[in-house]
């Protein structure tokens, strides 16, 4: 699935992600590029969430900025999942990709409509 491909890409560049904060502090050009890319991602996720709501896969927001903050959680997990895995396991391996992909997948589940939950189960064979 797409998320697993993305997580494998993160793993491939783990040398960067394990020292993410340091890299951002020490390299203004990389930081500027990252922040620009992050703004584009926010727009893309907002458009995705709106499409999923329109297609009755996701529910409407119940709280102000609920989906903006959901995206923020995805961003935090995406940026720091490797650090978490490294701390918890003393080493990092491709096996951690499945576990953290599941963390990302399941983060969306509470926001799904019944139709969305049925589709989720179908897609991920839960």
Report the location of each language-model feature.
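Hydrophobic alpha-helical connector segments
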Residues: 1-16
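Short loop-to-helix capping motifs
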Residues: 13, 26-27
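Short, hydrophobic secondary-structure boundary micro-motifs
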Residues: 18-20, 33, 60-61, 120
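Amphipathic alpha-helical packing segments from all-alpha helical-bundle domains
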Residues: 30-57, 68-83, 102-110
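C-terminal peripheral helix-coil segments that are non-catalytic and often amphipathic
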Residues: 83-126
């Amino acid at each position: 699935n797409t998320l697993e491909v993305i997580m494998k890409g993160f793993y491939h560049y783990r040398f960067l992600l394990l020292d993410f904060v340091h890299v951002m502090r020490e390299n203004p050009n990389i930081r500027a590029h990252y922040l620009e890319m992050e703004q584009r991602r926010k727009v893309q996720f907002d458009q995705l969430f709106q499409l999923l709501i329109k297609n009755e896969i996701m529910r409407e927001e119940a709280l102000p900025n609920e989906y903006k903050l959901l995206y923020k959680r995805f961003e935090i997990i995406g940026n720091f999942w490797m650090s978490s895995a490294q701390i918890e396991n003393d080493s990092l391996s491709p096996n951690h990709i499945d576990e953290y992909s599941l963390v990302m997948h399941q983060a969306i589940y509470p926001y799904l409509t019944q139709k969305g939950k049925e589709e989720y189960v179908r897609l991920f064979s839960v």
